[in-house]
Structures are given as structure tokens and as C-alpha cells.
Design a protein with these regions (language model features):
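P-loop NTPase catalytic core of nucleic-acid-dependent motor ATPases
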Residues: 45-155
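Conserved catalytic/switch belt of AAA+ P-loop NTPases
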Residues: 173-196
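Long, low-complexity, charged/polar intrinsically disordered regions in eukaryotic proteins
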Residues: 236-271
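AAA+/SF3 P-loop NTPase mechanochemical coupling elements
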Residues: 150-155, 189-207
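Conserved AAA+/SF3 P-loop NTPase catalytic/coupling segment centered on the Walker-B
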Residues: 157-180, 214-220
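N-terminal nucleic-acid engagement/recognition segments and initiation subdomains in replication
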Residues: 1-68, 72, 79-86, 315-316
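A short helix-turn-beta junction within AAA+ P-loop NTPase domains corresponding to the substrate/partner-engaging
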Residues: 214-232
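DNA transaction DNA-binding modules
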Residues: 258-350
């Protein structure tokens, strides 16, 4: 990135080929005999020191004063989930740890997901997480239909807000899952000629106005879904130096920043109310129930159960739906056993 010296433009901008050509032309207009290749040769040499703005910010913070600021920031979001402050604290440490490059093997694949009515300042809260000096590394404008740009954003931005999460289509959910857990970026830079491996900095946060938005039961552990019960208090001043100094101090003293099995269980259980249920799942317990102790019931394959539902409510019957229905039965914890004709499940007709 570059910035003009003695200019009123205080922000740094990407140094792409267009910028290099402009610098060369401006220099020639001033009577300096040089070409764009001369500038490129200088820029991409050891004459220009490597600069990481995130690390520059993090490693020039004051000492932490010992007062917790991460959990109180989470508590400005009115919600009924008692685990929210601790989960947000863990996610925040994870975000900072990946800015520092502490974990190159795994990405920060967990994302808070704030669900609430319009006007509750969800997006304002997400934006307030970034310190003002690093605000250019925050974005809420990501088009998942442009996959190359999304992948490059993992290197370009430090925090990405998936605004209007419910607008991510079902066909894009698989790509979103891939992006959330992708630890590095393998792509060709703009105007580049070869594929290079680039470091991932980005963590994710998301917002939505609608509650039934999780379509993949196995993927719910990647989200910290929170129903915002009122307007988020974004009027409190945030001491960014101490907020991030706390994260740096805790990471330096071995505080766990990754989510363990217990955390994932808490998230999965809390996310049930945000799950979007398929028609098959909604009708299953209208026509069947689980067998009680000592009750034999019927042992049926997913296709047999789905055929009965098809006769009752005209649910489409095909191989893809049968495979998905088997996952639904397992998720519901319905007793199963393996037979010669495949896995069968124990149910009683209601």
C-alpha cells in the first residue's frame, strides 16, 4: 500500500499496476526520467521494509491495566444467552491470534451471528469492534457470487461482516463453509501471473433480521447465534488500546483462544432455535414418534419412512432427499441399527 507524502490523503491505498503507472507518469511530468519498471524494481526490493499495519497496531499497545473490557463489550448486546460474553471473548481472542499469525494450520472458522430487528444497531456494533486506525481492514460488502474476490478478501481484510446473512443463497452455503475454514489463500493477485499462497487475516461476524437461517445442522457449530432483544448500546466509548491490550496479554499468558468440544456443544444447543427445518423434518413427528422403553415399533429404512410421508403430504421422493433424510433421522437421535438392506430406524406411527 502507498500514501502520497505531503498530501491531504491520509489513508493508504493498494499499490496496484494502475497506481504504479500513475506514479511513473506523475514523475515524468515533473521531469524525472524513470519508468514504471524502475518503480516496481524499487518497491519489490529490500529497499522498502515489510510493513504489517495490524502487527504494528498490536505490538505498540500499552500494558493491560487488568480490567476486563472484552466481555463488557459483548454485554452491550441485549440477549438471553448466558454464554454469550464467554463465547464472544473466546472468538475475540481467536481473531487477534490470527492477526498475529499464531495459528497457521486452522482458520478462525467461528462467526458470531447477531439476529434482530432493523434499527437495533447490529451492523454498528460489528463495525465498532475494529479500532478506528484499522477501519480500512473492515468490510460488510462481500459478494459471494464472485468467488475469487471473496478468497482474496481473506487476505485483504481483518474482519468481514456478512451483512444480511439470510441473503446468502442455499447454493452459496457450501462455498461459505469452505471460506470460513480455509486457513490460507491460494490465488493470483490482481495483475499477477502466478498463483501464490497468501496469509489469511480475516475473521467473520454476521447479522440478520430473520431467525430461521441455519440450513446445515452439522455446520451450526460454526456460528454463535444471538437474538438481539433490544437496541445495542453503541454510545459507550471504547478504549481500543486497552481492549486489544487485554487480548494480547491473555494470549501471551497462554489463554485458550480456540473453541473446544464443550464450547461447540453449547453453541450447537443454543443454535437449535435458529435452525431452518426441512418439510420432511417438520412432518416427521406429525406421523411418527420415537419408541418408548419396551415398545417394539417398526424398523424402517429412510426411503420407507419418506415414502409414507410422501403418501400423506406429497413430499417429493428422490435419491437426494432420501440421503438428506437419513442425516435428519441421525440428527434427531432416533435409534438405528445396520442390516443387510442398510441402516434402519425405530419409529412408532403416531
Amino acid at each position: 500500500e502507498y500514501r502520497e507524502r505531503l498530501s491531504f490523503r491520509f489513508r493508504f491505498n493498494p499499490l496496484d499496476k494502475r497506481a504504479l503507472n500513475s506514479i511513473a507518469l506523475d514523475a515524468q511530468m515533473e521531469g524525472i526520467p524513470l519508468w514504471d519498471r524502475d518503480i516496481s524494481r524499487y518497491v519489490y526490493s529490500n529497499r522498502v521494509p515489510v510493513y504489517n499495519p495490524l502487527e504494528d497496531f498490536l505490538f505498540n499497545l500499552p500494558e493491560w491495566d487488568g480490567r476486563d473490557r472484552i466481555r463488557p463489550l459483548a454485554q452491550t448486546v441485549p440477549c438471553d444467552n448466558p454464554h454469550w460474553p464467554e463465547l464472544f471473548h473466546r472468538w475475540f481472542l481467536n481473531m487477534v491470534a490470527h492477526w498475529r499469525g499464531m495459528d497457521k494450520r486452522y482458520a478462525n472458522s467461528v462467526s458470531p451471528l447477531l439476529v434482530g430487528a432493523q434499527g437495533t444497531r447490529k451492523s454498528t456494533f460489528c463495525r465498532s469492534i475494529m479500532p478506528p486506525s484499522e477501519c480500512s481492514y473492515y468490510t460488510d460488502s462481500l459478494d459471494f457470487s464472485r468467488k475469487k474476490d471473496v478468497e482474496l478478501s481473506l487476505n485483504r481484510f481483518a474482519l468481514i461482516n456478512i451483512d444480511e446473512f439470510d441473503q446468502v443463497s442455499a447454493t452459496q452455503q457450501g462455498f461459505l463453509k469452505h471460506i470460513l475454514q480455509k486457513p490460507v489463500v491460494n490465488a493470483r493477485r490482481p495483475y499477477g501471473t502466478s498463483v501464490v499462497e497468501m496469509r489469511r487475516y480475516a475473521s467473520f461476524i454476521a447479522t440478520s433480521n430473520h431467525k430461521d437461517l441455519l440450513t446445515d445442522p452439522s455446520g451450526s457449530r460454526r456460528f454463535i447465534c444471538i437474538e438481539v432483544k433490544g437496541v445495542i448500546d453503541t454510545s459507550r466509548p471504547i478504549d481500543y488500546d486497552q481492549l486489544y491490550a487485554q487480548a494480547m496479554h491473555e494470549l501471551a499468558h497462554g489463554e485458550r483462544y480456540w473453541f473446544n468440544d464443550a464450547d461447540e456443544y453449547v453453541m450447537t444447543e443454543a443454535n437449535r432455535e435458529f435452525q431452518q427445518y426441512s418439510p420432511e423434518e417438520q412432518f416427521l413427528f406429525r406421523y411418527f414418534r420415537m419408541a418408548e422403553a419396551g415398545e417394539e415399533g417398526e424398523w424402517m429404512a429412510p426411503a420407507e419412512i419418506l415414502k409414507i410421508l410422501h403418501q400423506e403430504v406429497d413430499i417429493p421422493l428422490n435419491a437426494k432427499r432420501v440421503a438428506a433424510f437419513g442425516r435428519i433421522l441421525r440428527k434427531q437421535g432416533i435409534p438405528s441399527r445396520h442390516t443387510r438392506k442398510g441402516t434402519v430406524y425405530q419409529l412408532v406411527r403416531a
